[in-house]
C-alpha cells in the first residue's frame, strides 16, 4: 500500500531525531517534483494540500496521481489534509482514501477546539488515519487562511499537555513565532517555549511556516522535538519566479512541456534543500 498514514513515519522521525517534510502541492507538476525528488533522496514524504488545493485540482485526481507516482518510484507517502476545518469535509476525504489529516480549530476557544478535534480523532482513528491539530495560532496567509499578526497566539505549554490528553491527537502543531508566507524580517522563534512543550508532550511536534526560516532555526527546532516541517510559500515562489524568467527570455513560448521544466527544476532545488535540512535523506 503506497498511500499511508503519517503516524508511523513521524514516530520513526521522533525516535531517530530528524523531521519529515510536508510539501504543499497544487497541480501535476508540483506533485511530480516532490515525489520524484523524495524518491531520488530516499526521503519519507508528506504531500500536503489545503482545501483550496483539493478544490482546484480535484480530490480524486490528487489521490490517483499521487498513488501512481508512489508506485512508480516505490515510495510510500502520506497525502495530508492541511488546515481543514470541517468534520464533514474530512470525513468525505478519508472515505476517498486520505490517511493523514490536520483539523484546524485554532480560531476557536480552547474548549471548542478540543471538542472539534476530539470528534475528528474519533472518526479518523476508526480508519487508521492520523490526526494533527494546532494549539495557538500562526499569523500570515496561506490560501484562504488569513490571520493578522495581532491575532497570532503562542502555544501555552500547560494547555498543550491538556490538549493532547483530551483529544488523543497523533501530532501537535505549535505556534512559537513562525508565520505562514515569507518573512519581511528574520523571525525570533521561542525555543524555550518549544523545549517546555517538548517536556510536557510526548507526541511528534509540527512546525508550520517554515518557508524562509534560517536553516539553523529549523535544525534547532528539530533538536527540540519537531518531527514534521511544513513548506508551502517557498515552493510557489521558486516555481513562479522561474516561469516568469522563462517568459522574459522566451516571450513567444507556448509549450508547457518546455516552460514547465525550469519551474520544476527551481522548485526541486528547494525540495532538496529542505530534505537535507530536515536530516531525512536516506531514511526510508
From Swiss-Prot:
GO CC terms of this entry: cytosol
Catalysed reactions, semicolon-separated: D-tagatofuranose 1,6-bisphosphate = D-glyceraldehyde 3-phosphate + dihydroxyacetone phosphate
Binding site for dihydroxyacetone phosphate: 181, 209-211, 230-233
BP-aspect Gene Ontology terms: D-tagatose 6-phosphate catabolic process; galactitol catabolic process
Cofactor note: Binds 1 zinc ion per subunit.
UniProt keywords, alphabetically: Galactitol metabolism, Lyase, Metal-binding, Zinc
E.C. number(s) listed in UniProt: 4.1.2.40
A Pfam family hit: F_bP_aldolase
Cofactor: Zn(2+)
InterPro entries hit by this protein: Aldolase_TIM (IPR013785), Class_II_FBP_aldolase (IPR050246), FBA_II (IPR000771), TagBP_ald_KbaY/GatY (IPR011288), TagBP_aldolase_GatY (IPR023955)
Enzyme class: lyase
An MF annotation (GO) of this entry: zinc ion binding
CDD domains named in the record: TBP_aldolase_IIB (cd00947)
Active site: 82
NCBIfam families, A to Z: cbbA (TIGR00167), PRK09195.1 (NF006626), PRK12737.1 (NF009374), tag_bisphos_ald (TIGR01858)
Protein function: Catalytic subunit of the tagatose-1,6-bisphosphate aldolase GatYZ, which catalyzes the reversible aldol condensation of dihydroxyacetone phosphate (DHAP or glycerone-phosphate) with glyceraldehyde 3-phosphate (G3P) to produce tagatose 1,6-bisphosphate (TBP). Requires GatZ subunit for full activity and stability. Is involved in the catabolism of galactitol.
Homology family: Belongs to the class II fructose-bisphosphate aldolase family. TagBP aldolase GatY subfamily.
Protein known as: D-tagatose-1,6-bisphosphate aldolase subunit GatY
Organism this protein belongs to: Salmonella paratyphi B (strain ATCC BAA-1250 / SPB7)
Gene of this entry: gatY
